[in-house]
């Protein structure tokens, strides 16, 4: 099928489908849309040639894929992606736009309604990750992207409830058609494993960019090793930019997304410690790795203030929120690892909030809410 065919929904993203986020978050959602009987398309920015296996998976589910080149990094690269996404945008009755760049590109090319799928405060995160605070012109352009996305969106989804008031403060005319849909996982692939391994094992999962606090992670791991006999593995995809974390890991593995469920099941718990000076950007964050650990039945250790995680983990007894007293935090962790009910509480939390099937249903309802009927 060509770009001239008008599909029910086209998913627009500047992320790569073949990398971790694409494989864990986007592809399952697309397949879920197709399972609803929708004619589905997707346009994405790829850093390497599209893998044949992924092409076949999408094709077998009746999903049209238009991969375009990711291009260069940096602000100029981002501008180029806006132009290319707009230029090659497939036709659709409605669009699902992942992030500011995708929403802006869609609004430039099409007048059809779209969901602005806010995956966090993008500009705020880029300032932290790329040091943009001194690049005034770049910041102004990025703010214009966010403003345009907010003004044109017919519906907005966020990973957390905590970030929506921030968006409303910045953009008073933002639609009130808002739904919280956290980072989700396929609960069938990330199946429940009730028994924690006898040997204590910490799995550091995924790419640890500058958003994560490796100094505090190192401090926590150092204290942990004094109290527990523990083996630490860092596991990531091919896209990782660093050779080592340097936080006390005993081994490193490079695995694909389909290999991750087994690796998590063989671990005792996960960890996600973000920098405390990340400002409002933390309010919009919901790390994929956290959802994956909870789905399999593994508790997580996280820093305070990450999206809605504080209340979720505390209410369900599914993890530890780091405090100023790391020794007490470690005691809480030991208690969780010794409690045979911990795995069940983690899975229950995942089923309540992080189910991909639930996300598909919510997104599908939003498409109906903005005036489309696929019957």
Predicted regions and their residues:
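Nucleotide-sugar-dependent
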Residues: 20, 24, 212, 257-265, ...
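Membrane-proximal helix-turn-helix segments that form the acceptor-binding/catalytic region
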Residues: 31, 83-90, 104-105, 116, ...
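A charged, aromatic-enriched C-terminal amphipathic alpha-helix characteristic of glycosyltransferases
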Residues: 324-326, 337-369
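A short, glycine/small-residue-rich beta-strand->loop->alpha-helix junction that serves as a flexible
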Residues: 13-28, 49-50, 97, 209-212, ...
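Acceptor-binding helix/loop patch of EC 2.4 sugar-transfer enzymes
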Residues: 14, 70-73, 115-147, 165, ...
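Carbohydrate-associated surface elements
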Residues: 162, 184
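N-terminal strand-loop element at the rim of the active site
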Residues: 13-20, 32, 36-77, 163, ...
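Conserved catalytic-core segment of nucleotide-activated headgroup transferases in glycan assembly
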Residues: 25-26, 32, 186-189, 201-244, ...
């Amino acid at each position: 099928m060509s770009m001239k065919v008008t599909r029910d929904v086209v998913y627009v993203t500047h992320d790569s489908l073949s990398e971790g986020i694409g494989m864990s978050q986007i592809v399952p959602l697309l397949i879920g849309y197709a399972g609803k009987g929708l004619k589905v398309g997707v346009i994405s920015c790829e850093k390497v040639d599209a893998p044949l296996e992924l092409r076949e998976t999408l094709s077998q589910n009746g999903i049209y894929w238009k991969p375009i080149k990711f291009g260069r990094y940096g602000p100029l690269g981002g501008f180029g992606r806006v132009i290319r996404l707009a230029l090659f945008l497939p036709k659709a009755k409605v669009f699902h736009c992942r992030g500011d760049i995708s929403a802006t590109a869609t609004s430039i090319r099409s007048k059809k309604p779209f969901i602005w799928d806010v995956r966090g405060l993008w500009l705020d995160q880029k300032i932290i990750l790329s040091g943009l605070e001194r690049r005034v012109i770049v910041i102004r352009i990025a703010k214009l992207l966010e403003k345009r996305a907010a003004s044109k969106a017919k519906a907005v989804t966020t990973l957390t409830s905590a970030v929506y008031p921030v968006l409303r403060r910045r953009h008073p005319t933002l639609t009130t058609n808002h739904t919280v849909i956290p980072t989700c996982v396929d609960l069938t692939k990330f199946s429940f494993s009730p028994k924690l391994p006898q040997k204590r094992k910490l799995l550091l999962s995924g790419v640890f960019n500058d958003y994560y606090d490796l100094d505090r992670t190192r401090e926590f791991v150092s204290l942990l090793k004094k109290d527990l006999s523990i083996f630490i593995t860092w596991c990531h995809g091919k896209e990782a930019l660093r050779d080592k974390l340097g936080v006390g890991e005993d081994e490193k593995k490079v695995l694909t997304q389909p290999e991750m469920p087994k690796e998590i099941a063989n671990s005792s718990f996960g960890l996600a410690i973000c920098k405390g000076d990340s400002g409002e950007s933390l309010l919009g964050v919901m790390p994929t790795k956290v959802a994956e650990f909870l789905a399999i039945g593994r508790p997580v250790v996280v820093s305070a203030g990450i999206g809605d995680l504080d209340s979720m983990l505390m209410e369900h007894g599914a993890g530890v929120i780091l405090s100023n007293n790391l020794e007490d935090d470690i005691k809480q962790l030991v208690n969780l690892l010794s409690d045979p009910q911990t795995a069940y509480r983690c899975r229950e939390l995942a089923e309540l909030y992080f189910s991909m099937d639930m996300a598909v249903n919510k997104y599908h309802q939003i498409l109906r809410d903005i005036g489309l009927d696929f019957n």
